[in-house]
């Protein structure tokens, strides 16, 4: 029997890939948050959407600089995913707290996270007010991945990409 869902409807769309969303301030101060709300919306031109809470420091920075990077981790970075999802970067250096090393991105000022197996650099072309979140539409400026974890353009199971199941549950496939 099907049960009517009245709250947390988005859980029906899980699992979703858990990733690091990096941004930067106008003064070049880097920031990172854990995110799972992203989706491609166009192949040509390549466009992705990330949805971020309006009250977050990350949303503030993305609105200021109009750019972000999606950094795709493996299970080796699960601890850092938890840390970056629990605290604000407004007053804390989450990179230091989580033991993450940053690398200069290829095309944007927002940083890339070392140890991630994929990166999607984006420039925001549209922001939509979507309830408690902003939906940032990002034109993909550059995308690259560790080829040892890709086969025919798809992730292999060896990449062990974390999946967010909803709430505080994250798993990965082997």
What are the functions of these language-model segments?
Residues 1-174:
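Basic, polyanion-binding surface patches
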């Amino acid at each position: 029997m099907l049960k009517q869902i009245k709250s947390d409807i988005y859980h029906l769309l899980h699992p979703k890939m858990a990733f690091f969303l990096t941004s930067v301030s106008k003064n070049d101060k880097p920031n990172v948050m854990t995110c799972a709300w992203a989706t491609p919306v166009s192949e040509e031109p390549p466009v992705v959407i990330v949805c971020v809470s309006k009250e977050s420091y990350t949303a503030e920075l993305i609105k200021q600089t109009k750019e972000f990077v999606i950094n795709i981790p493996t299970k080796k970075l699960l601890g850092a995913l938890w840390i970056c999802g629990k605290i604000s970067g407004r007053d804390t250096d989450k990179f230091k707290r989580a033991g993450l090393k940053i690398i200069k991105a290829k095309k944007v000022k927002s940083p890339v996270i070392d140890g991630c197996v994929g990166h999607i650099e984006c420039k925001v072309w549209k922001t939509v007010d979507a309830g408690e979140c902003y939906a940032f539409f990002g034109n993909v400026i550059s995308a690259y991945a560790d080829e040892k974890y890709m086969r025919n353009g798809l992730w292999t199971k060896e990449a062990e990409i974390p999946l967010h199941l909803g709430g505080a549950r994250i798993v990965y496939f082997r």
